[in-house]
Amino acid sequence: MTELKAKEPRAPHVAGGAPSPTEVGSQLLGRPDPGPFQGSQTSEASSVVSAIPISLDGLLFPRPCQGQNPPDGKTQDPPSLSDVEGAFPGVEAPEGAGDSSSRPPEKDSGLLDSVLDTLLAPSGPGQSHASPATCEAISPWCLFGPDLPEDPRAAPATKGVLAPLMSRPEDKAGDSSGTAAAHKVLPRGLSPSRQLLLPSSGSPHWPAVKPSPQPAAVQVDEEDSSESEGTVGPLLKGQPRALGGTAAGGGAAPVASGAAAGGVALVPKEDSRFSAPRVSLAEQDAPVAPGRSPLATSVVDFIHVPILPLNHAFLATRTRQLLEGESYDGGAAAASPFVPQRGSPSASSTPVAGGDFPDCTYPPDAEPKDDAFPLYGDFQPPALKIKEEEEAAEAAARSPRTYLVAGANPAAFPDFQLAAPPPPSLPPRVPSSRPGEAAVAASPGSASVSSSSSSGSTLECILYKAEGAPPQQGPFAPLPCKPPGAGACLLPRDGLPSTSASGAAAGAAPALYPTLGLNGLPQLGYQAAVLKEGLPQVYTPYLNYLRPDSEASQSPQYSFESLPQKICLICGDEASGCHYGVLTCGSCKVFFKRAMEGQHNYLCAGRNDCIVDKIRRKNCPACRLRKCCQAGMVLGGRKFKKFNKVRVMRALDAVALPQPVGIPNESQRITFSPSQEIQLIPPLINLLMSIEPDVIYAGHDNTKPDTSSSLLTSLNQLGERQLLSVVKWSKSLPGFRNLHIDDQITLIQYSWMSLMVFGLGWRSYKHVSGQMLYFAPDLILNEQRMKESSFYSLCLTMWQIPQEFVKLQVSQEEFLCMKVLLLLNTIPLEGLRSQSQFEEMRSSYIRELIKAIGLRQKGVVSSSQRFYQLTKLLDNLHDLVKQLHLYCLNTFIQSRALSVEFPEMMSEVIAAQLPKILAGMVKPLLFHKK
């Protein structure tokens, strides 16, 4: 026995180059099962490893099974246990083990390279196995993982003796007429526990050797040889993609072959973690194709473990049908039950991160046939095309998933047909160049399964939100939402999926969310179980808006009949009933009641677009209240218990939330015909109520006698606080933040005085019936105090506004809409940067004012007259506010002489904008010509 030391092995994973035979031999003789990941050198640079004594004699060539002699007729003795132990790295062979002889390492290195080069390199025409150039021409070699595929015909290892790593063929050693077999690249990312031998098209899977009923003892051939017909090479995890189908290709990795005829085959361990059925090796018997090496073969294709729970009963039945009905011809291997078919989303997908779903590329040396049978177990990473918003994804992630229900398989009954929706358009199918994939002759028992599946269909999980898809018909089908130009609502309504079993069986049109079907079976990855009402357990979170009863009806009536039940329209939680006119949960019901009765002034810290769901519904009360008002919740709606009888009048047909707000057209204008239904406050007006500022105090000391300077100073401090309140209110105003930031600042600076005096008139009208000027709770001026002040004439001018409110009996809804229009009533002469958005927003609030008028006026004539009176009041405010601007600017200029204090922010606005306004550099927007 010869004891050698291998020095400086190169990394076997070097792309584009082959490792030296020394490192191949040293790794082949390593410990067979070190763990799931065998340590290896991965860098290009060579690294010095510890000297490993390698016992060549008796380990490189295993003796054939008992009862057979080597070709030269010698009789061999089985190796001692010490010889076998000497093959493990880190274990020194005993000095007297066998008849070993020591050679200097420098002499043995060349001999070892020559022997391993001859042994491991595949033979080819005109090639010498002892030539080092041959090793360089061959693709990089690689090593087996700890778990190898099992060969049922191989003789198992017994009595703790390890199975030999290589098998010597019985044929003459000098035969070199065979050609290098084409090899397949193991997909990258494949875990070591799934490293299986890949089939080579046209190669025999295992030599025709009958399995021995008795365990064969492992014997080692001590004879030296210079040539070997087969090639033994393990698969490499993470090997680069193969560019060609031959072993001579620069990027192709050779595939380890099975045992030669008469040799002891490889007996790897079975991995019990994966119970997926595999094609029996006993059926992979095919003649040797001309020009192929009998050893260049494989066991079975790699297995993709299903990522979803399976119907075990159906899978077992389908596997039994495959095993009983498969046939092989022409040396082509059958398609694995877990191999993706051509045209599947994963067949041509990009590399997937992770080790369970590798990126597979096969050399184009065998084209699969078109009649390959689509199997149930074709699981690949699903190609998901999800166009959902964030709350939809989170709602789906929180929902329990029921993939396959237990029970009878629908495919077992020929008369049972599931209405599978037509799959969405996919990219053109690219035929995969996959060696070893051939047609599978389906048995009669499998015909019922294939009859319910579309040709070439696999697991296609394509969940998409089809905004442009035609709406389906059915009891829960939404009516199409027209574009704004065609007289439709401005709300981004999302359709509800019609997933009832009766609707699908009756052949209804496909839902907007197509169900996930697998060969006509219940869908995977989506709810298969439904509620007793026929509605799915999980709904889309976009159920904020009501659906119209009929598209053809001219009156914009809305009902709850088309809404799903048992789901809160605000947060998506389980609804407890219809509260305040909307189907909500108990939490949202209590929140809305407290928010509306307590008159809280909630402000959003973000952009008024916070997500309101079951988990985050308490984060932002402002957005939650906005969503409640948007859904149509009103305190007067508590009396309506039967939600399928409630009608919401003119609520969602004109103005939309979220932003932007659309421009009205002829078909969208509100008519003033009397309605027979119960009239509720429109949602946008409810939102305006919720964002109305709280009561602001002036901080005036009423215990001291009034002076001109003290009153003006208190009014200036009140104006500063009201100016800050206007800024916060405008930011919460729907549509205002869609404008350019410069336009927002300009509009506030031009309109802050109008908003203050208009609010003064409303407070005076509501609290003191217009008899006094109600500036603040701590600053109320009656007529006597007005006369004592230095601005009595100005007080009389401001007093006209509450008197007009008393005369017209302005409602709160009308006041809120008029207040927004005052913000949008003055623009620069050159216009705004976002002029189109401004006009769109202003037109929308004009229509809101019309709807607010329609809540009280029942006739067209009376409603039109009131609209004229209110808009005339807005026009008259321009002249009144101009007087206030002039007085304010004069007081600001003489502030030191008058001992009047002006706060900083108010001073900046007065100095920057009032001269422009008084100079006529602004353009007032009037409703009526003077």
From Swiss-Prot:
Residues 187-204, 431-454 have a biased composition (Low complexity). Residues 566-640 bind DNA. Residues 684-930 are annotated as: AF2. There is a cross-link at K7, K387, K532 (Glycyl lysine isopeptide (Lys-Gly) (interchain with G-Cter in SUMO)). Progesterone binds at R763. It is found in: Nucleus; Cytoplasm. Residues 166-304 are annotated as: Mediates transcriptional transrepression. Phosphorylated on multiple serine sites. Several of these sites are hormone-dependent. Phosphorylation on Ser-293 is highly hormone-dependent and modulates ubiquitination and sumoylation on Lys-387. Phosphorylation on Ser-102 and Ser-344 also requires induction by hormone. Basal phosphorylation on Ser-82, Ser-191 and Ser-399 is increased in response to progesterone and can be phosphorylated in vitro by the CDK2-A1 complex. Increased levels of phosphorylation on Ser-399 also in the presence of EGF, heregulin, IGF, PMA and FBS. Sumoylation is hormone-dependent and represses transcriptional activity. Sumoylation on all three sites is enhanced by PIAS3. Desumoylated by SENP1. Sumoylation on Lys-387, the main site of sumoylation, is repressed by ubiquitination on the same site, and modulated by phosphorylation at Ser-293. InterPro entries: NHR-like_dom_sf (IPR035500), Nucl_hrmn_rcpt_lig-bd (IPR000536), Nuclear_hormone_rcpt_NR3 (IPR050200), Nuclear_hrmn_rcpt (IPR001723), Progest_rcpt (IPR000128), Znf_hrmn_rcpt (IPR001628), Znf_NHR/GATA (IPR013088). One of its GO terms (biological process) is tertiary branching involved in mammary gland duct morphogenesis. Residues 420-430 have a biased composition (Pro residues). Belongs to the nuclear hormone receptor family. NR3 subfamily. This is Progesterone receptor. It comes from Oryctolagus cuniculus. The lineage of its organism: Eukaryota, Metazoa, Chordata, Craniata, Vertebrata.
